[in-house]
Design a protein with these regions (language model features):
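Eukaryote-biased intrinsically disordered, low-complexity acidic regions enriched in Ser/Thr/Pro
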Residues: 1-136
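Eukaryote-biased feature marking scaffold/signaling PDZ-domain proteins and nuclear chromatin regulators
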Residues: 2-4, 22, 30, 41-43, ...
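Structural signal for hydrophobic/aromatic residues that build the beta-strand cores
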Residues: 7-9, 58-60, 229, 262, ...
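Intrinsically disordered, low-complexity acidic/polar segments
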Residues: 69, 238, 286, 319-320
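Internal glycine-rich, Lys/Arg-flanked active-site/core loops of soluble domains
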Residues: 133-290
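Flexible, small-/acidic-enriched active-site or ligand-binding loops
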Residues: 282-304
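Short solvent-exposed strand/turn elements
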Residues: 318-330
Length: 330
C-alpha cells in the first residue's frame, strides 16, 4: 500500500517561536507507517527509536529529555513527489568509505559471492528457519545502528509470512526492500564492498531477495522488458573505464540496482551521468512498481551481480550529462 499521507515534525531551532517561517521535516518511511498505524488505531502515543509521538497534543517528545518537544502534523499527500535520490543513483565517492569501482569485471553469471557464502554456512535449513534467521539478522543490524524500532517493524513483517508460501515470502521481501530505511542501503553497501562480515546477518534476506527475482510465478506477473534509467555521479576515470569497455567483455553491478521506467524522474537527480539500460525479454528483473510503497517511482529492480554489455558512451550537451548505454545480459 502506498503512502497517501505524510507525517512531519517542526524543525525550526525554536519550534515554538511564532511569526517566523515554519520549517518542517518528514519522518522516515517506516516511522511514518508506525505513526499512521497508531493514529488510525486511536492510540494515545507510539514509540520511535528516539522519540515518543503524543497524538493528544500532537508533539514529538525526546526520550532522553522529555522537556525537548516539537510540534508534529499530518498532511495528505495525494501527489507524492519522488525524493529518494540515494535509491536511484550510484553512490558517489564521498559517500563511500573505500575506493570503489563503478562495475565489477567478473560477470560471473551466477549468484553473488555473498549469497554463496551464506549457503555454504547454512547447507541444510528449512524455509521457516531461513525466515527466522533473516529477521534475527535484521534485528541485530538495527541494534548496531540504533534503529531498534525500525528493525523490529521489519522483522515483524517477515514473521507474518513465516508459514506462508514461497511466493508470498518473496513478495514480502521485495516490499520490504522498497521501504526507505537502513535495510536496502546496508545490504547494497555490503554487496558492493563484498563485505563477508555481514553474511550471517544480511545473507538470509539477500538470498530471499535475489531468488525472488527468478520466481516463475512472479516473473509471469512482473517481468519487465524495455528501457530503464539510473543516475550516477561518476569520476572521469570511471567514465573512461566504461568507454574503454565498449563492446568488450561483460561487466556486472555487484549490488541490487533500482532503476526507473520514467526517464524524467531519473534525470532530475544531481549527477553527471545517466545510464540508459536495455532490459531484454527473458531477463530476471522485475517491475516492482505495484509492489513498492512508492509506485510513482516506476521502479524496476535489477538483481545483484547483474551482467551487462556496455554499448555506447556519449556526452549530451543539452543535459550536460554523460549517457552510458547498457544492454542487460542476465
Amino acid at each position: 500500500m502506498s503512502n497517501t499521507y505524510q507525517w512531519l515534525w517542526k524543525s525550526n531551532s525554536n519550534p515554538w517561536q511564532t511569526n517566523i517561517e515554519e520549517q518542517w521535516e518528514k519522518y522516515s518511511d517506516i516511522e511514518m507507517t508506525i505513526i499512521e498505524n497508531g493514529y488510525q488505531n486511536k492510540y494515545s502515543h507510539v514509540e520511535l527509536d528516539n522519540f515518543i509521538i503524543d497524538f493528544k497534543h500532537l508533539v514529538q517528545i525526546n526520550k532522553a529529555d522529555s522537556t525537548k518537544q516539537r510540534p508534529i502534523k499530518r498532511i495528505s499527500d495525494i501527489s507524492l513527489q519522488c525524493s529518494r535520490e540515494e535509491r536511484f543513483t550510484l553512490p558517489s565517492h564521498n559517500s563511500l568509505n573505500t575506493r570503489r569501482k563503478s562495475f565489477g569485471d567478473e560477470a560471473r553469471w551466477m549468484s553473488p559471492k555473498f549469497i554463496e557464502e551464506w549457503i555454504k554456512r547454512n547447507p541444510r535449513i528449512t524455509l521457516t528457519q531461513r525466515i527466522e534467521k533473516a529477521a534475527q539478522g535484521i534485528l541485530e543490524e538495527g541494534r548496531l545502528l540504533g534503529k531498534i524500532v525500525e528493525s523490529q517493524w521489519l522483522a515483524e513483517q517477515l514473521f507474518e509470512v513465516k508459514e506462508k508460501s514461497w511466493d508470498e515470502i518473496a513478495l514480502r521481501c521485495l516490499f520490504l526492500y522498497t521501504r526507505e530505511c537502513f535495510l536496502y542501503k546496508l545490504l547494497n553497501k555490503a554487496l558492493r564492498e563484498e563485505d563477508l562480515s555481514k553474511v550471517d546477518t544480511l545473507g538470509p534476506f539477500c538470498d530471499f531477495l535475489w531468488n525472488s527475482l527468478s520466481s516463475e510465478n512472479l516473473k509471469s506477473k512482473y517481468q519487465f522488458t524495455g528501457l530503464v534509467y539510473r543516475s550516477a555521479s561518476l569520476e572521469l576515470d570511471e567514465i573512461d573505464a566504461y568507454k574503454n569497455s565498449i563492446k568488450k567483455n561483460p561487466k556486472e553491478w555487484l549490488g541490487f540496482s533500482s532503476t526507473s521506467k520514467n526517464r524524467a524522474l531519473a534525470e532530475i537527480y544531481d549527477g553527471n551521468t545517466l545510464f540508459i539500460i536495455n532490459v531484454p525479454s527473458q531477463s530476471q528483473h522485475l517491475d516492482i512498481s505495484t509492489i513498492s510503497n512508492f509506485p510513482v517511482e516506476e521502479e524496476v529492480l535489477l538483481g545483484a551481480s547483474t551482467s551487462f554489455q556496455i554499448e555506447h558512451v556519449k556526452y549530451d550537451e543539452t543535459t550536460r550529462k554523460h549517457h552510458i548505454y547498457l544492454r542487460i545480459l542476465w
